[in-house]
């Protein structure tokens, strides 16, 4: 009996060791590229940050912030209306929203390009900002958030007390929607910040370099083979290591998204979204 217990204990310990080793290898697989990126970027000594890098960084910030503002202004009312009202076409509209979520963003670029050209906004910042604000996933998240029994009872009580629909939405729904609004803003900013294809198509002209967002500007610099020598086109480098330059620019692209995540982590990691993902 004792030997059987010892054998079971040894098997359990061996299983734990194997599990930890596999988990460590799995973690290392994802961690090594990030660690390399950070350490390689420290090999770059910047004598001067060029105008293009700062300009592209500010462009990305403006585009992402404006797109997130449009997304919040459209997703919350749309999700609230679909969740709390019965109207003709409600179910088809919800199904259409879900179907649009499944369409790859790249598949919508050509129609958006033709539409922007038709209204004479091609190469304009609006050709990038407005599509950033069209966020069907945010509409669906808002719908899930408001489509709960607790909100239904709360809204019905407010209406019984004499509140009109605008007062219910403005004074009750909006203040209570901060968790889902934070999630929509975070997801929209990540999607906008990392979007390369849409700005690349909209800013097709060579004289629109000053309107590039950061990922597009950096990618074109790298794709054009300007990664050797002292100048990378956006920064003056005192190093002869092109990988260091590339790592620095990639880190400059990733870092703002990480900052947004850190700022939003108390919402994302604290269970405030349990009402969203039911």
Language-model features: locations:
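Short, Lys/Arg-rich, polar N-terminal cytosolic tail immediately upstream
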Residues: 1-13
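A structural signal for multi-pass alpha-helical bundles of membrane permease subunits
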Residues: 11, 15-278
């Amino acid at each position: 009996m004792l030997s059987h217990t010892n054998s079971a204990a040894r098997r359990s310990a061996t299983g734990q060791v194997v599990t930890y080793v596999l988990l460590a290898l799995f973690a290392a697989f994802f961690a090594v590229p990030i660690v390399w990126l950070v350490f390689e970027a420290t090999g770059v000594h910047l004598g001067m940050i060029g105008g293009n890098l700062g300009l592209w960084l500010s462009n990305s910030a403006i585009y992402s912030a404006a797109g997130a503002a449009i997304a919040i202004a459209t997703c919350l009312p749309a999700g609230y209306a679909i969740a709390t009202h019965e109207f003709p076409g409600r179910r088809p509209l919800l199904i259409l929203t879900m179907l649009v979520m499944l369409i790859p963003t790249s598949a919508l670029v050509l129609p958006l390009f033709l539409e922007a050209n038709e209204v004479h906004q091609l190469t304009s910042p609006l050709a990038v900002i407005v599509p950033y604000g069209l966020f069907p996933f945010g509409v669906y998240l808002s719908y899930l958030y408001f489509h709960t029994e607790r909100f239904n009872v709360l809204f019905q009580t407010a209406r019984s007390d004499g509140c009109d629909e605008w007062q219910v939405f403005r004074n009750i729904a909006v203040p209570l929607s901060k968790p889902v609004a934070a999630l929509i803003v975070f997801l929209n900013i990540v999607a906008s910040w990392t979007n390369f294809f849409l700005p690349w198509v909209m800013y097709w002209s060579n004289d629109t370099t000053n309107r590039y967002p950061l990922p597009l500007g950096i990618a074109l610099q790298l794709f054009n083979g300007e990664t050797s020598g002292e100048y990378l086109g956006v920064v003056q480098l005192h190093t002869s290591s092109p990988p260091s330059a590339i790592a620095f620019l990639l880190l400059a692209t990733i870092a703002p998204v990480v900052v947004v995540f850190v700022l939003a982590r108390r919402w994302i990691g604290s269970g405030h979204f349990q009402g969203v993902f039911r």
